[in-house]
Curated annotation (Swiss-Prot):
The lineage of its organism: Bacteria, Pseudomonadati, Pseudomonadota, Betaproteobacteria, Burkholderiales. Residues 188-203 have a biased composition (Low complexity). This is Large ribosomal subunit protein bL25. Residues 188-214 are annotated as: Disordered. Pfam families: Ribosomal_L25p, Ribosomal_TL5_C. It comes from Methylibium petroleiphilum (strain ATCC BAA-1232 / LMG 22953 / PM1). Signal peptide: none annotated. Part of the 50S ribosomal subunit; part of the 5S rRNA/L5/L18/L25 subcomplex. Contacts the 5S rRNA. Binds to the 5S rRNA independently of L5 and L18. The gene is rplY.
Length: 214
């Protein structure tokens, strides 16, 4: 994905506030040299941030007529308004090793025996994983095939088919669960409400006791 950045001349809290009022977003690019202070068009950045690829893939930043490869590292949003306050990028090249969280794309869920045969549901325990690799080989996402998952089974990190150069960063966790089949609770049948027995109507032609005594 591509985006355009411009030099940010003014600095400080007041300058950043005026920049935001004018529809711009202050940002910084660090790594492989001196930090580069930039500004971006707010609306263009806001819409780009809605795309998954903008968060988890190499980006081509056009700056002063030249292209640089960067990764999105941090976004600061306003507490209650749909406004981007600040953005950080990391400058990288093909030889830079990076760690980055990438989303998981789950496929074949409807074909899993635990779903198709046993009417279970698949719980997605995690939806993204942190990976380490060369910047040039960073995957936009990881595909998780759930097609063989049966009742009572779980899919773990070690079960994933990763690109050869990509390694999952576990940070002390041992083979965590990615997804698991859970069974739906059986619905209890509603209790039958006893219907009161209607009193039998008195037979025709019979007189009451009082009438017989007369």
């Amino acid at each position: 994905m591509k985006f355009v950045a411009y030099p940010r001349e003014l600095q400080g809290t007041g300058a950043s506030r005026r920049l935001r009022i004018s529809g711009k977003v202050p940002g910084i690019v660090y790594g492989a040299g001196e930090p580069l202070k930039i500004e971006l068009d707010h609306n263009a950045l806001f819409h780009a941030l809605k795309k998954e690829a903008f968060h988890a893939s190499l980006l081509d930043m056009e700056f002063n007529g030249k292209s640089q490869q960067v990764l999105l590292r941090d976004v600061q949003m306003h507490a209650f308004r749909p406004q981007v306050l600040h953005v950080d990028f990391q400058r990288v090249d093909a030889t830079t090793r990076v760690t980055k969280k990438v989303p998981l794309h789950f496929v074949n869920e409807e074909n899993a025996p635990g779903v198709k045969l046993d009417k279970g549901l698949i719980s997605h325990v995690v939806t993204e994983l942190e990976v380490e690799c060369l910047a040039s080989q960073l995957p936009e996402y990881l595909t998780v095939d759930l097609g063989e998952l049966a009742k009572g089974q779980s899919l773990h990190v070690n079960d994933l088919k990763l690109p050869p150069s990509v390694k999952v960063v576990l940070r002390g966790k041992k083979n965590p669960v990615i997804a698991t089949v859970v069974m739906q609770a059986a619905e209890e049948a509603p209790a039958e409400v006893a219907t009161p027995t209607a009193a039998a109507p008195a037979a025709k032609g019979k007189k009451s006791e009082k009438q017989n005594k007369k």
